[in-house]
Amino acid sequence: KILKLCNEHKIPVVPFGTGTSLEGNVVGNEKGITICLEKMNKILSVNVEDFDCRVQACVTKEQLNDYLREDGVFFPIDPGANAAIGGMASTSASGTMAVKYGTMKTVISGLTVVLPNGDIINTGSRTKKTSAGYNLTNLFIGSEGTLGIITEIQLRLSPIPESIMAAVCHFPTLENAVQTAQQVIQYGIPIARIEMLN
């Protein structure tokens, strides 16, 4: 109802989750309103055998991974801050593990979205692959609340790796660092996380 009213009266709306964005995505408009989603913080379902789950928009990545840990699966997108999953979907977040696990577009299989006119739609499905119809899910990922407010997210999960090894490498030039990263990937060396620091 709120979005419908705001739409009818041309009042700008900014959805707010955890506020961890570094890009100013949650900066409001003096003639608009902010809709706080912090109470939408429930993990709705987990299907370990199918490697997926459904969460509300303000579940954080740490909250979800703490919940999943005992089942041997995890949510692999790691933008750095303990962001809300809805915000991560809205900004098409990625992180240092994108080299192995992809981005939010890779791990989201469906959304529940409240449109500006107040209608509630569901996009996508739990299926791993489908070619039926338009890909409305990807339309909303990265739209930063401009097309509607994401309230629920269907996510693909990954198995927790048996072991993890970390290394820091120094390079004389930026070009050397980039070439080495490309070669590591081309040779098929399993790498889950890569980050360049200057």
Give residue spans per PLM region:
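Glycine-rich N-terminal segment of FAD-binding domains in flavoprotein oxidoreductases
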Residues: 1-40, 75
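Short proline/glycine- and acidic-rich turn/helix-capping motifs at secondary-structure junctions
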Residues: 22, 196-198
